[in-house]
């Protein structure tokens, strides 16, 4: 829309649709995007990778042709995804989208929480520096104990089993020679400048289990093992996507450490455990989160999006 020679940016209404794996987020998001003339931003730590289509349950080419999706097929297998990258991609999507509504859809709620709360500016490192730091951390017999020795305040905020956050804290220490808590004090978080309305799907446990079992069978019938085999022979074995559910079990099968039946059972079981963690995270980590069945959430999003309130 042009006014007096200036390009007036379309005001964006950001709506997040969260939920555990197998809860029906993708199907509902396609339905909502069609009804609301919206576009979709994929908040998924696996769909962001090229060539991982079956394991990530990526939207079909037909769905993507009808509705614009952002943050799909952005990374190569040997590249890393993280919250700052998703924030950059979300801001890019907001900038280029011509639609009034952008649906943020996915199961990687941890990244959304990080974006909402704000991200501290991280030290800029060259590829060589990253490799050197990774080697330093790899030599530690107990990274958490080491973090505790250099920065008790930071260690107190991190659970001993939270290897991801421990690793991130140690990266900052080795990159800056500064205790992470001091670094964050000097580089405070900047909360996200745009309001995001939050909705999450809740699904009865037995129905979710059936969905996940069916989804696993479909993935295997669609060629999951063949997809992973092609990638595992091409890329470094420690690449981030190879740790994901559906991928790591397929690798064990390819290494003849699981039978086909055990592979199916392992993917189903691990996806159920993930779904439980995702549910708990969504319900405990977000304020003002509307939780309901698919029909309840659909109705609430339609009502909200047609209201005059932005954000």
UniProtKB/Swiss-Prot annotation:
Tell me its cofactors.
Mg(2+)
Q: Where is this region: Interaction with substrate tRNA?
A: 44-47
Q: Which GO terms describe its molecular function?
A: ATP binding; tRNA dimethylallyltransferase activity
Q: Which UniProt keywords apply?
A: ATP-binding, Magnesium, Nucleotide-binding, Transferase, tRNA processing
What is the top-level taxon of the source organism? Bacteria
Protein residues bound to substrate:
21-26
Residues under site feature: Interaction with substrate tRNA: 108
Under which main EC class is this enzyme filed? transferase
Q: Where does ATP bind?
A: 19-26
Subunit-structure text: Monomer.
Name the record gives this protein: tRNA dimethylallyltransferase
Provenance organism: Helicobacter pylori (strain ATCC 700392 / 26695)
Q: What is the lineage of its organism?
A: Bacteria, Pseudomonadati, Campylobacterota, Epsilonproteobacteria, Campylobacterales
- Gene it is expressed from: miaA
């Amino acid at each position: 829309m042009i006014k007096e020679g200036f390009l007036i940016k379309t005001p964006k209404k950001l709506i997040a649709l969260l939920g555990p794996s197998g809860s029906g987020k993708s199907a509902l998001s396609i339905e909502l995007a069609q009804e609301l003339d919206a576009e979709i931003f994929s908040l998924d730590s696996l769909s962001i990778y090229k060539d991982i289509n079956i394991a990530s349950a990526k939207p079909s080419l037909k769905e993507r042709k009808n509705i614009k999706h952002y943050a799909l097929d952005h990374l190569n297998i040997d590249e890393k995804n993280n919250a700052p990258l998703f924030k950059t991609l979300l801001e890019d999507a907001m900038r280029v989208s011509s639609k009034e509504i952008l649906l943020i859809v996915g199961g990687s709620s941890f990244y959304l929480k990080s974006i909402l709360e704000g991200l501290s500016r991280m030290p800029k490192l060259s590829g060589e520096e990253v490799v050197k730091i990774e080697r330093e951390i790899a030599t530690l017999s107990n990274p958490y104990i080491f973090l505790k020795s250099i920065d008790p305040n930071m260690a107190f905020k991190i659970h001993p089993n939270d290897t991801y956050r421990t690793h991130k804290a140690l990266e900052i220490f080795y990159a800056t020679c500064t205790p992470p808590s001091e670094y964050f004090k000097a580089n405070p978080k900047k909360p996200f400048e745009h309001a995001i309305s939050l909705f999450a799907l809740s699904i009865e446990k037995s129905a979710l289990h059936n969905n996940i079992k069916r989804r696993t069978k479909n993935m295997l019938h669609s060629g999951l093992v063949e997809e992973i085999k092609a990638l595992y022979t091409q890329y470094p074995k420690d690449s981030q996507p190879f740790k994901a559910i559906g991928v790591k079990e397929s690798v064990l099968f390819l290494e003849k450490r699981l039978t086909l039946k055990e592979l199916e059972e392992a993917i189903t079981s691990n996806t159920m455990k993930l779904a439980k963690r995702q549910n708990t995270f969504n319900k405990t980590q977000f304020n003002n989160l509307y939780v309901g069945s698919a029909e309840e959430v659909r109705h609430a999003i339609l009502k909200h999006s047609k209201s005059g309130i932005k954000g």
